[in-house]
Curated annotation (Swiss-Prot):
GO terms for cellular component: cytosol. It comes from Buchnera aphidicola subsp. Baizongia pistaciae (strain Bp). Pfam families: Thioredoxin (PF00085). One of its GO terms (molecular function) is protein-disulfide reductase activity. GO terms for biological process: cell redox homeostasis. Residues 2-109 form the Thioredoxin domain. Gene3D superfamilies: Glutaredoxin. Participates in various redox reactions through the reversible oxidation of its active center dithiol to a disulfide and catalyzes dithiol-disulfide exchange reactions. This is Thioredoxin. InterPro entries: Thioredoxin, Thioredoxin-like_sf, Thioredoxin_domain. Keywords: Disulfide bond, Electron transport, Redox-active center, Transport. Disulfide bonds join C33-C36.
Amino acid sequence: MTNCIVELTDGIFKQYILESKKAVLVDFWAEWCNPCKILAPILEDIAKEYEHKLIVTKINIDKNPNTAPKYSIRGIPALLLFKNSELVGTKVGALSKVQLKDFLNLYLK
C-alpha cells in the first residue's frame, strides 16, 4: 500500500469519515481475497488521480471485524463512498479502472 491510501481501523473509522473535508472511498478487503489484490493497484491510481476531491482508504475486515457488519458487508472487495459524512454509494466486487471512475464521477461532480 502506498502513502496515497489511508489504512483505517475499527477504532478510527467513524471519526475519520465524520471529520473528512473530502469524499472518502473505503475499500473493505482481506489479505486472502484475490479480487481485492486485483483492485489494489487500481485504487492506488485512483487515489493519485482524484487526490484533490477524494481520500481513498482501506479497512482489513479480518483485523477490524466490527465495522463491516454495520454496513451489511457480505462480500469483498466492497467499496463504500461517503460524502459529507453520508454513505452515497456502494459497489461490491473487483471493478476495472473505467468502472470505478464511472462510479466515482456519478457522485463527485
